[in-house]
Amino acid sequence: MIHASAIIDKSAKLDKDVSIGPYSVIGADVEIKSGSVIGSHALIEGPTSIGKHNKIFSFATIGGDPQDKKYDGEKTYLEIGDNNIFREGVTVNRGTVQENSKTIIGSRNLFMAYVHVAHDCIIEDDVVMVNNSAIAGCVKLEKGAILGGFSLVHQFCNIGAHSFSAMGSAVSKDVPAFVRVSGNPAKARGLNTTGTVSYTHLRAHETSL
């Protein structure tokens, strides 16, 4: 269902069962796949492709111009997979031609309220970014990584699979897989045992199948 107050650009491509809430704006060159739900007052700008069964809540801004002085109106992209949740006030920017020209988000990720994902970032699957965490340009979050509330990640950092960055961490270096970090500057505090156990259990289950 598309609410009568929503504004949809003529070039946008929406599958028939996509839901658009009141006063939301869907811009040019936006594609939204089946089962996705866009709440009220959301803004989605293109070129942006959004997969199936995503939920985008009120006042999220998805696919906005990169916050980079070098950006001069070039055509850059945002790609989003399936089954992601973008809570209230989340911002996700497109890429820049100086880097990948594309911001990429995988599937089954949770972006809590007021999270920021900058230009050219790559977010794999099953990532959690807790409220008010933010990542600068060209950051990569590997599968299952968790950023605690108010965590900040410096540009070009790689955050390893199933790692955990505690609340308020200021991350300026790469974080290895399965490692737990905290502090300003963030330092390694040991293994993320919860993530390690979950991953080991999952791998054992997959092997048994």
Annotate the PLM regions:
Residues 200-207:
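Conserved small/polar residues in nucleotide/adenosyl-binding loops
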Residues 2-182, 186-187:
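Structural signal for interior beta-strand "rungs" in well-ordered beta-sheet cores
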Residues 188-194:
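Acidic/polar active-site rim loop that often engages polyanionic ligands
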Residues 195-199:
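Short, glycine/charged-rich beta-strand-loop motifs at protein surfaces that mediate ligand recognition
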